Amino acid sequence: MQKNQRTTAQPIGAILFDAYGTLFDVYSVALLAEELFPGRGQAVSVMWRDKQIEYTNLVSTSSHGAHYQPFWNLTRSALRYACKRLGPDLNAEAEDALMNQYRHLSAFPENRDVLQALKARGIVTGILSNGDPAMLAAAVESAGLRDLLDHVISVDAIRKYKTHPDAYSLGPQVIGLPPEQIAFVSCNSWDALAATWFGYQTLWVNRYQLPFEELGTQPLHTGSSLRDVLALPGLTRAPV
């Protein structure tokens, strides 16, 4: 794990994880997409994800949230756009199959070991996600992580998506700790950046060896897998 900023870490009492891309592999739908759309499945899955994120930003910034839609709805709309853009015929059966796959995304293999280690240290664990409550409940249950998460926080409660500051403020509100005593972990660079601006101790899980955003701010730490969470300096000062 790489430390990007020279700061003295405060004790970490809680760790919040982004869900989609961080705990759950959003590109695991590519296998099914390739079965349904031979030769175009990978491209569909990538555009689907990109358009999904674009839609969350769009509805969060337009008319003060007047156009908010639940994440499930935006995910379906993004899938339809990707298929229209790239050409494969998305019939109702294929759409339902892909959406069901998204509801039960594959979890990354290290998730359970990392969460168990954190719980053994007395760390509060949770998810802070754009996903709506029903989506998150299904994903957590499917991955077998329910017993290892103290909180599953959805931005649906405030109808504002990350990267809006109000979305990140849900963490301290629910957990009862200041953001500097909460670590926020995400594989999405835009998410890690906004969480850093908000004041969390941040870890960007750079699974795909990508460059970070060019906006003058780095996350506090960069790693390559979820296991790097266990090396966060603030954990050494946390109660065990």
At which residue positions do the language-model features occur?
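Asp-based, Mg2+/Mn2+-dependent phosphohydrolase catalytic module
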Residues: Q2-I15, Q116, L128, D132-P133, ...
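Active-site neighborhood of HAD-like aspartate-dependent phosphohydrolases
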Residues: K3-I53
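Hydrophobic side chains within well-formed alpha-helices
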Residues: V29, V44, A94, L145-L148
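Alpha-helical elements of Rossmann-like donor-binding domains used by nucleotide-donor carbohydrate transfer enzymes
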Residues: L31-L32, M47, S77-Y81, A97, ...
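Hydrophobic alpha-helical core bundles mediating ligand binding, dimerization, or RNAP-core interactions
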Residues: A33, W48-Q52, T75, L98-Y102, ...
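Short helix-capping segments at alpha-helix termini
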Residues: F37-G41, R85-L90, G144-L148, G176-L177
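Short, acidic loop-to-helix structural element flanking the phosphoryl-transfer center
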Residues: W72-N73, L90-I127, A137, P165
